[in-house]
Amino acid sequence: MKAAKLPIVVSVLNHKGGVGKTTTTANLGAGLARQGLKVLLIDLDVQANLTHQMVGDLEANEPNICEALLEEKPLTSILRPTGTKGLFIAPAGESLIELDLNLFNKFGREYVLKNSIAQTEGISSFDVVLIDNPPYISLATVNSLAASDFYLVPVSCEYLPMMGLKYLQKTISRIQKVNPALKPLGVALTMYDKRESIGQSVAELLREELADQVFETMIRVNTKIKGSPSTQQTIFQFENDPKGRGTLDFTAFTQEVMGRLNLQKGAEV
């Protein structure tokens, strides 16, 4: 019997917080869904900011990604639709803080998430899975990267990032022993402000060091991007304007990502 086609899995990560990691995950996911693709978001960050933005905070007893992984179950029972057609989430809850401790003694602990994704009923109907990771290395991060085809690194243009990127690359190199197929999708420049010289310096430095790994689109500083999570909306919903700055930036970024992943758009939402 022919195996079901699995979606492309992308880990979104950076060891530094406050770089737009969750914002990038949420709005890229929405951008892909708006292009007619079916997208699954997985929240592995104990802060659960992605979950809050997409579906609100979970009650303490509601099942979430932690229970699915620890019980080695498919994700079917915890998947939730979001306010964007074609965009779903496997949410995080309070119990996620215990994930590393409970995974530690499991056999094949690096592959628990990969197995859960593969066992999820209907997973072949998804085109892309985006995983939001905590801003530090953990067993959750190892699971994410072991399950992924690509990794995407958001970098804020508000500070020079090279030391952090070198440390992250060391982590990736170690993980590639577990998942040799893991490849870089690219570096996404966030919080770009043309009025600040540091932003231009960061962009130039990264393009010099990493060449075409850096996406052409730069996500500009935008109060609406910062404000949309508190309203449980993506930038597309919050601006509700095809010419809005955030909408334009994330639409362009989404199209670049689709090009790198060789994804064709479906019926646009």
Name these PLM-found stretches.
Residues 1-269:
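P-loop NTP-binding core
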